[in-house]
Amino acid sequence: MIETPPLVDQYCHGVLRTELGLGTFEAQLMRSAGPPAAGTTFFDTQTGFAVRRWCPPLLGLEPHATPARYLARRRELGAAETARLLLRGSGVAAYLVDTGVPGDLTGPKELALAGDAEAFESVRLELLAEQVADTSGTVGAFLANLAEAVHHAATGAVAFTCATAFTRGDTPAVDPEPPGPGAVRGAAGRWLARRPRGGAVRDPVLLAHLLWSAVASGRPLQLHTDEADPAALTGFVRATAGFGTRLVLLGGYPHHRRTAQLAAAFPHVYADTGAALGRTGARAAAVLAELLETAPFGKVLFSSGGRQLPELHAVGALVFREALGRVLGGWAAEGSWSWRDAERVAALVAAGNARRVYRLDRDETPP
């Protein structure tokens, strides 16, 4: 039996405050372009089965309760109490919360209160630029205000996050090298001239400027890869070597082995277990084992990737803990590892690596 400390969930979002019907709840279970096909349900997925396995006991039901029974119990308890029970039952001691997604979601303080945990903010660079653009009348004011906003955010947040630079097929490739002042001014002028209020930043020059502004801050930079091949990051990874800023690659499944290879090849790169474990459910141990084939154990960080449904935070944590126990416990049981080493590595991946990388403990020194 592998004992792990309380987890640090190094990437997640807030949860919805409202009651959810069957259709709304089901829509949050999967990343999908639309509702389930006629005659099917998103509950018949690895994520759906994982929710039914792990969440009902936290709400006082038997494992594998039917969706109807589970949602009825959810309504009996109410959204706030459901979130409280699920978050507190997940064994998470600290959350790093990306506050840059739309919707009526709880912020870090509310998530901390509901989960009886610490919570820290990860600032999304795109949202920061969009907020500054909404209040800046000229290109010069925008760039000056953006620099000040990044500096101010770095004093309170534990990390920056970029969600679009390396993930979107409709976004041109971002040059890995920092853009010059003239290129940045030109890109800012074009963007400000044509964007509506609240318009998203997609310009590759501005995205590169945001990335390099974050690198200069010294805060860890979380980079989404989603389902894209992390190989697209290689140029930026090479260019940022030696700056002292840690890059944490989020997502990557089904290319998680490539993420692990980048973490092994570059001292400043770290690999995230991510929402893939919750999405793969009963196969999570196999996915985690593949990540641990190549990545140095001090470079792997747990996250749930939970968003909107507290069930996804809970499932991410509980599936991870079980998968970690199965993988490391299996290697120890067969004699490949000692039990002491297995528990030491479990503690690193579960919490220790994140606490070191993000300097969550005041006495931590930079990695």
Where do the model's predicted regions map?
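Mid-to-C-terminal alpha-helical segments outside catalytic/metal-binding sites
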Residues: 1-10, 16-61, 68-73, 297-299, ...
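Divalent metal-coordination and catalytic microenvironments
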Residues: 11, 95, 160, 271, ...
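Short, basic, glycine/proline-bearing loop/turn elements
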Residues: 67-70, 129-136, 269-277
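Active-site gating/metal-coordination segments in enzymes
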Residues: 86-220
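Catalytic pocket-lining loop regions of alpha/beta-barrel enzymes
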Residues: 193-303, 353
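Short active-site-adjacent structural elements
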Residues: 309-313
